[in-house]
């Protein structure tokens, strides 16, 4: 992450070949909009449908693979650091 707290990105790929298995030290929220991809989380595979949301905690192995190139691969990705997430939790205590 470039920011110390959080980042949000919109991606639109006409040709996506996948990424290798990896982890992060931050939380990842993945909002799937369009495409034909499978996300693998800790070796469990899920074919994504438009509107699906995936939450990936820090340290969890994951990767995305393209199933076909018939549609653009569109998604929002939101990353939030563990420290900032903890600050938000503390602010929302009753």
Please provide the spans of the model-predicted regions.
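Conserved metal-binding segment of the jelly-roll/cupin
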Residues: 48-65
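A hydrophobic/aromatic-rich effector-binding and dimerization subdomain
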Residues: 1-10, 61-94
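Residue-level recognition of the GNAT/N-acetyltransferase active site
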Residues: 42, 57, 81
């Amino acid at each position: 992450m470039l920011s110390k707290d959080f980042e949000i990105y919109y991606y639109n790929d006409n040709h996506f070949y996948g990424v290798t298995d990896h982890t992060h030290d931050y939380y990842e929220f993945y909002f799937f909009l369009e495409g034909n991809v499978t996300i693998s989380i800790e070796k469990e595979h899920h074919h994504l449908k438009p509107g699906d949301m995936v939450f990936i905690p820090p340290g969890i192995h994951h990767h995305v693979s393209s199933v076909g190139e018939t549609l653009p691969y569109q998604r929002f990705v939101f990353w939030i650091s563990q420290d900032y997430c903890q600050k938000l939790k503390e602010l929302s205590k009753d």
